[in-house]
Every structure is written in C-alpha cells, then in structure tokens.
Amino acid sequence: MLAVKQHGFGGREQLSTCELPRPTPKEGFVLVRVAAVSIHAGDHHMLTGRPYITRLVGLNEIPGMDFSGVVEEIGPGVANFAAGDEVFGTTDTAGGAFAEYVSAPAKNIVRKPATVSWEEAACLPTSGMTALQALRLGSPVRSGQRVLINGASSGVGTFAVQLAKSMGAHVTGVCSTQNVEMVRSLGADVVVDYRTESVEAAAKADSESYDKIIDLAGRYGWRQLLMPRGSLVAVALPESECIPCVLCSIVCSPCCCCCLSQQKSHALMQAVTPADMEELAGMVTDGNLRVVLGLQLSGINEVPDALAGHSETTGQGHRKGKTVISFAAKPETMTRG
C-alpha cells in the first residue's frame, strides 16, 4: 500500500511517500480502506517532537490519527463491524492513518451517517471531541453563561464556537484579522481580532467577565478575565524543550492564585469517546454543526506538504478550520449519500 513514512522528528524533510506492507488487523482491530484524513495539532506535535514530552510516545512509522473510510477486514473478536461498513474514527497516538489502509481499534471508530461526507467525517474525531469535552470539563457550560474561546478559527475552535452556542452560551471568539468574518458566521456573539484589540479591552468594553475560557492557543494570562467562580480549560501545549516545564503547565493552573480563589483551571486530556463522535456526526446530519473545511487537498502524495505546512501555521497561530485530504483511489461505494 502507499503510505506516508516518518523517518524522525522534525519537519518536511522527515516525511516521504512510499510502499509499505498492508497491515493485518489484530484482535479487537478493524482494517479500513481510507477515504479521507484530517490533520490536527496532535499530528503537528508528533511530527516535530515538540514539546519533547510527546517523544515519550515514540516515533510512529506512519503518522496520522483521524480518518474515514470503508471497513475492509475485521480482526478476531470484533462483532460490531463488518466488511463494507462506512466508518470514521481515530488511531489516537498510535498513528497509521496517513496510508491507503489503516488498522484501528474497533473501540475507536463509529459508523458514518450517509449524509456526512468522507471529508466531514474525517474532521470530527479529535478536534470535535476536544471541543465537546472542553466545554463539558469541570462545570459544563449552561445556557446564559459567557464563554470565551481563544483560537476560535482553528479546527477545535470552529467546533467549540458552534457547540457553545448550541448550549445557549454567549460566545466571544478570539482570532486573527483574516478569520473574523468566518468566526462571526459560526454564531459568535463577539469576535475579537487580537491583532488590533486586546482581549482585556474587549472584556472591559462589555463590562463582563467570563464563566468559562477555552484556551486553544496558550498565549494569555486569563485570571483577570474570569468570573469569581469561573473556569479555564487549557488545551494547547507550550512548545517548550523543557519536559518539567510542560508537566508544570499541565499540572499547575495558568490562572492559579491563592488557595482561597474559587476560580478553577483544567488541562484537558482528550479521551477517545465513541458516543461523542456519534453525537457530533448526528449534529452535522441535523444541520446543527458545520465542519469548516479550510485547506482541501486530494491524494496521499499531498499529505507530507500539508502536514509540514500545518505545523508552520499552527506555530504562527493562523489556522482556519480543518485541513483535510481526500484519497483519490476510493471504492465505488465512497460517494456521498
């Protein structure tokens, strides 16, 4: 099979496209012929090996996590899928998705609704689940609460804006100039262009603080913007070469103050949850969630440049929606329902 191979940690120079043996699904796994893949921040960290703590996972020969496709073969002990099923899911940190075939744990995939495209489905697993779980972590968002999303134009951010609105929240999105209108189109009540206005100034203009802040960029100190009982969910990992520093950023609150404070902070460790993926796909089917497809490419040979380019723009904070690659060689069944 044709696959993307990663030779080491770094940039584009560590990626190539070559022929590799097609995997055989082991017990509890499913072999999927890939229709589309998406790229997210985790792929960036696994390519660059930064922060260094990500290197503890090890180097995956084939990178990539999130995919959609058709079940080709099931491994021993798999009873809930059969050859021909249209599915989407993730390999999580095990990688392997950037190939014509991927072997993934059956517990990490769900059926794709006919009305959800291959490209949309491939974008849902990690980014969609991260957004949903961030909004539910600690004290779940309730109707009427004020939520700020830093990094609102990113893959996770575009989901988070819409999901927070669906929960009845008043949403402020923070993004760069070129993405302001897009974030507003997703339903954000207030959009702050961090290039021209500080978030602090925008909050003062509103004369309000926030019940929950979702930080997808890791660039501000948020304590002064939280309500007395507000909470911060930190999703972004700092690009630090110091493993203790990264661990401290996870364990220690970016907004922690004295022990008397009732403000809470959480470092999100996203968990693969099939029920969340099914919920997200259902919202897309019902027209209540839009997958923002930013860069759309076709063919596995596009993956190395797309992954390297995603890493560059992620570091610069300029993400716009999801990067998705459709694979040219699709089974005849791979048409949108």
What role is predicted for each listed range?
Residues 21-38, 50-94, 216:
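Glycine-rich beta-strand-centered segment in the early N-terminal region that forms part
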Residues 97-99, 176-182, 277:
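Short, glycine/polar-rich helix-capping loops at beta-to-alpha or helix-loop-helix junctions
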Residues 271-337:
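C-terminal hydrophobic helical "lid"/dimerization subdomain
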Residues 84, 99, 144, 188, ...:
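Local beta-strand N-terminus motif with an aromatic residue
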Residues 172, 190-265, 333:
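Glycine-rich cofactor phosphate-binding loops and adjacent beta1-alpha1 units
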Residues 122-196:
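Mid-domain Rossmann-like dinucleotide-binding core that forms the NAD(H)/NADP(H) cofactor-binding site
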Residues 86, 146, 230-232:
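Short glycine-centered segments of the SAM/dcSAM-binding site in methyltransferase folds
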Residues 45, 65, 73, 80, ...:
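NAD(P)H dinucleotide-binding glycine-rich loop of Rossmann-like/cofactor-binding domains
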